[in-house]
């Protein structure tokens, strides 16, 4: 494994990961053991969903984020599938809607109650039937409302209008083998896919055409994945011919050679990439690994810059990633992962260390919000639009609320003589120290204290006398000036 050791300037160089305390984990969850390389976990600012083991069908758990600690075995699940659930994903435009794909060849879309489940949810809002083999991939369109993509082991990609349960597009001739994953581009005009035939394809779903293809993007036989980046480039993970895990960056305009190719190690778990378009950081989580590596993607060679590795003791069965709008910006949190162990889910917080308490504009540019940019019908008609952006500044809460304190000091508490006495009123100035001295005496009752107060009193009297004489001289000079004698 060879990472570049050249020190380069980056605000993400010191990003560090930290697991939360045990009482903030989700304990006693029976994570699914099904053989499939999906994340098994989906999370949004309201809910955490985890695919779990279930007898007699498929199920997944939906928990409010605040429901940490031990999860009772009788806690209600979403359990309408007749076969194991393989993939789940929250709708980006509605935090209460989640889609699931299953071995029973169906896609189901569910509406989760506002406060979470109080009883098992068996009735989906809509059932989408069109695949002839198990459905291993479901992914929502990033900007068009109610548009959902599903891909099955029948090598078919279907695109649905969930609002009408209508099949919009069927792409059944572009993939000759099992589809490992699918990823939309930023505005949802194209998607890329990774296939068992070792090819990465870029596809226009509305025309049903192949825009670009790279055969043998990674030469190894193990699963690979491909995701679109914000600038249109494609990031892939896979294996070399010698079964070493690899990362690569591709320019869709020229797929002949990768812009960058890095080898990581010789572990055999599939690498799951998670991309943050706001920071251009890619987090790579290996199934069965106990680490999360992260890289910054830039326009400068070598393009993929290794930042750091978060390592823990337990291997991960799956990982979910919180959308940017669900992070705590006041703590400089730039990513949060939900790591699945065999029996629990552990949040891991990625933080950029900053000294200032102020909102960090450079870490939090405007990000994709929950509002859809298009309706399904507009997208079908050929319109494209980027995500509707929101500012995270309103979510910022200062970590330290400082109270204003005004301190008024008694002139006698300072041992040094002060020239702050009022020169215009020398007569009443003398009794004031005497009263203060009397008060100090009654409180202190010590001879030393009395002597100190008397010294201060004498100094103040001398000061008052001096100021009085000075005022007299000034008045005398003023009189001569007015009389024209000066």
UniProtKB/Swiss-Prot annotation:
Tell whether Coiled coil is among the UniProt keywords.
yes
Q: Does the keyword Cytoplasm apply?
A: yes
Q: Which InterPro entries match?
A: Coronin, DUF1899, WD40/YVTN_repeat-like_dom_sf, WD40_repeat_CS, WD40_repeat_dom_sf, WD40_rpt
Q: Can you say where in the cell this protein is located?
A: Cytoplasm, Cytoskeleton; Cytoplasm, Cytoskeleton, Stress fiber
**Name of one Pfam family that matches:** DUF1899
Q: Record's Gene Ontology CC terms?
A: cytoplasm; stress fiber
Coiled-coil positions: 446-484
Molecular function terms from GO: actin filament binding
- Main localization is cytoplasm
Any one GO BP annotation for this protein: cell migration
Q: Which domain of life is it from?
A: Eukaryota
Query: What are the record keywords, sorted?
Result: Actin-binding, Coiled coil, Cytoplasm, Cytoskeleton, Phosphoprotein, Repeat, WD repeat
Described by its record, this protein's role is as follows:
Regulates leading edge dynamics and cell motility in fibroblasts. May be involved in cytokinesis and signal transduction.
The family this protein is said to belong to: Belongs to the WD repeat coronin family.
* Oligomeric form and interacting partners: Forms homooligomers, but does not form complexes with the other coronins. Interacts with Arp2/3 complex components, including ACTR2, ARPC1B and ARPC2. Binds actin.
Protein's name in the database: Coronin-1B
Q: Which organism is it from?
A: Oryctolagus cuniculus (Rabbit)
């Amino acid at each position: 494994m060879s990472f570049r050791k050249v020190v380069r300037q980056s605000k993400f160089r010191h990003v560090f990961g930290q697991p939360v305390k045990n009482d903030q984990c989700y304990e006693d969850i029976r994570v699914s053991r099904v053989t499939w390389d999906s994340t098994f976990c989906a999370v949004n600012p309201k809910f955490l969903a985890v695919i779990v083991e279930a007898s007699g069908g498929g199920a997944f758990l939906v928990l409010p984020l605040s429901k940490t600690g031990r999860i009772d075995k009788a806690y209600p699940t979403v359990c309408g599938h007749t076969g194991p659930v393989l993939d789940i994903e929250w709708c980006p435009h509605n935090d209460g809607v989640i889609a699931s794909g299953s071995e029973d060849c169906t896609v189901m879309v569910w509406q989760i109650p506002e406060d979470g489940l109080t009883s098992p949810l068996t009735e989906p809002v809509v059932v989408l039937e069109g695949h002839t083999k198990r459905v291993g991939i479901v992914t929502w369109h990033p900007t068009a409302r109610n548009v959902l993509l599903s891909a099955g082991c029948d090598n078919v990609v279907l695109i649905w209008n969930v609002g009408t349960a209508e099949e919009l597009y069927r792409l059944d001739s572009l993939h000759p083998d099992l589809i490992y994953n699918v990823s939309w581009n930023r505005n949802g005009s194209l998607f890329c896919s990774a296939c068992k035939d070792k090819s990465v394809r870029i596809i226009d779903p509305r025309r049903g055409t192949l825009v670009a293809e790279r055969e043998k993007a990674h030469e190894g036989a193990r699963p690979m994945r491909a995701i679109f980046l914000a600038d249109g480039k494609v990031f892939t993970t896979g294996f070399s011919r010698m079964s070493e895990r690899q990362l690569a960056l591709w320019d869709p305009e020229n797929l002949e050679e990768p812009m960058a190719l890095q080898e990581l190690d010789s572990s055999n778990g599939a690498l799951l990439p998670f991309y943050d378009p706001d920071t251009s950081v890619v987090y790579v989580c290996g199934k069965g690994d106990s680490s999360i590596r992260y890289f910054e993607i830039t326009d400068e060679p070598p393009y993929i810059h290794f930042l750091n590795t978060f390592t823990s003791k337990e291997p991960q069965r799956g990982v979910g990633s919180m959308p940017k709008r669900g992070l705590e910006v006041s703590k400089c949190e730039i990513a949060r992962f939900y790591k699945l162990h065999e029996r629990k889910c552990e949040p891991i917080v990625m933080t950029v260390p900053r000294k200032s308490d102020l909102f960090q504009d450079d870490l939090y540019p405007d990000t994709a919000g929950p509002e859809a940019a298009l309706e399904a019908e507009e997208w079908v008609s050929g319109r494209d639009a980027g995500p509707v952006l929101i500012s995270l500044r309103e979510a910022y809460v200062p970590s330290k609320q400082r109270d204003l304190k005004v301190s008024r000091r008694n002139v006698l508490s300072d041992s040094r003589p002060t020239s702050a006495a009022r020169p215009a009123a020398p007569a009443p100035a003398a009794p004031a120290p005497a009263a203060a001295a009397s008060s100090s005496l009654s409180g202190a009752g010590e001879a030393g204290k009395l002597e100190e107060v008397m010294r201060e009193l004498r100094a103040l009297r001398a000061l008052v006398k001096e100021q009085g004489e000075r005022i007299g001289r000034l008045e005398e000079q003023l009189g001569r000036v007015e009389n024209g004698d000066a």
